[in-house]
Curated annotation (Swiss-Prot):
Catalytic activity: an N-acyl-L-amino acid + H2O = an L-alpha-amino acid + a carboxylate; an N-acyl-aromatic L-alpha-amino acid + H2O = an aromatic L-alpha-amino acid + a carboxylate; L-phenylalanine + (9Z)-octadecenoate = N-(9Z-octadecenoyl)-L-phenylalanine + H2O; N-(9Z-octadecenoyl)-L-leucine + H2O = L-leucine + (9Z)-octadecenoate
UniProt protein name: N-fatty-acyl-amino acid synthase/hydrolase PM20D1
Cofactor note: Binds 2 Zn(2+) ions per subunit.
Cofactor dependency: Zn(2+)
Organism listed in the record: Homo sapiens
Carbohydrate-modified residues: 252
UniProt binding sites for Zn(2+) 2: 125, 157, 217
Subcellular location: Secreted
Gene: PM20D1
Any further remark recorded for this protein: Genetically increasing or decreasing the expression of PM20D1 reduces and aggravates Alzheimer's disease (AD) related pathologies, respectively. These findings suggest that in a particular genetic background, PM20D1 contributes to neuroprotection against AD.
EC category: hydrolase
GO biological process: adaptive thermogenesis; amide biosynthetic process; amide catabolic process; amino acid metabolic process; energy homeostasis; fatty acid metabolic process; lipid metabolic process; proteolysis
Record family assignment: Belongs to the peptidase M20A family.
Amino acid sequence: MAQRCVCVLALVAMLLLVFPTVSRSMGPRSGEHQRASRIPSQFSKEERVAMKEALKGAIQIPTVTFSSEKSNTTALAEFGKYIHKVFPTVVSTSFIQHEVVEEYSHLFTIQGSDPSLQPYLLMAHFDVVPAPEEGWEVPPFSGLERDGIIYGRGTLDDKNSVMALLQALELLLIRKYIPRRSFFISLGHDEESSGTGAQRISALLQSRGVQLAFIVDEGGFILDDFIPNFKKPIALIAVSEKGSMNLMLQVNMTSGHSSAPPKETSIGILAAAVSRLEQTPMPIIFGSGTVVTVLQQLANEFPFPVNIILSNPWLFEPLISRFMERNPLTNAIIRTTTALTIFKAGVKFNVIPPVAQATVNFRIHPGQTVQEVLELTKNIVADNRVQFHVLSAFDPLPVSPSDDKALGYQLLRQTVQSVFPEVNITAPVTSIGNTDSRFFTNLTTGIYRFYPIYIQPEDFKRIHGVNEKISVQAYETQVKFIFELIQNADTDQEPVSHLHKL
């Protein structure tokens, strides 16, 4: 039973890994305001070839973001020209406005025929993390296709989403589609660093008085075959994100010669401090959030006694927590995590270093705040010789609604059932990763993070790692999902007002 329970909980963790140059145009003509008939998501052989070639071309543009101060701006500009080239219908349609924001990000405004319907936003980003060639089976920016698999940096994070959004819209427009509900497409150029493009787009929309029905960004996946004897896939939609804090610890001492060292050096003091942090994890916060929801939904799929344990987390919380903290992934969803990422000290082998610095990254559980984690950290270190400098930080994101009246969540759920009929379990989760959507909480209470892609355990390592890849079939299905989602959003249903939950 213990082994089976660990497997179940491991599944839960995997999920968490889970502007302005303006070309203005007219909206749809008054005679075009009738509701369009449903367009089937069936693509010709020529269209399928064109869509995969478009993705491969996008991968070949090295839109690398190294830091908030350094990125490949030439490639970022080239990518803007590229989407104009491969999606001519999108950029030439009369009821679509395209704006370049913060020099390289892009905002598309698609004017719907029914102004009474609240608009929504689809998001993605086209910048990627660096990809040194060592360890790659093919050059990381080759976009090479082998046996139905496209390789390259950005195939999973997140050029596939960028291209799928525009590709789906292009195919709909070619079929004379006119949306009833207006929507926006936001493409960020620096999500992997500062997110200034997304911040500027959010501010721009707010200045125009826009309030959104919902937002869809990158996030959860469809997980399959993660647990022995559990063969049902599960779609995990992230309804929140953990917070984050980058904290620098610093020790200053008088420098000197190593032949007459002091009792403690700056390196020794700092090493002891970060060691205490690693050996004293933040408290477990199980609570009644998305983890409990997922466990309870999975409970019915298992026999006694696992089903009893999972369906009653309030009773078995100590047991479940003990199992979850044994695995790094499951541990990350029940507490704030502590990761030492940078250590700097010393300039010469015979010189006592005057300064030692260490940077620690905390991913903050929704049950805590930045200030609470900072105070806990100071108490754990308990050494007044160590200075603390917050480099960057933000609190956990609010939890978006996932009930029957949550329009965005239910549209995603409906589209999952349509495109992936074999998936009959959809659950809300909290993402341990962060996205550009965190800059849009001023525009909606419904922010959802979801990749319409099946993911395997080894695929997580490829995101930001070597040999990132996506199958042609998976990408085609991603395009199909967006194609269907846009049409599903033309419902008369409107979102019910929700307050953000923390």
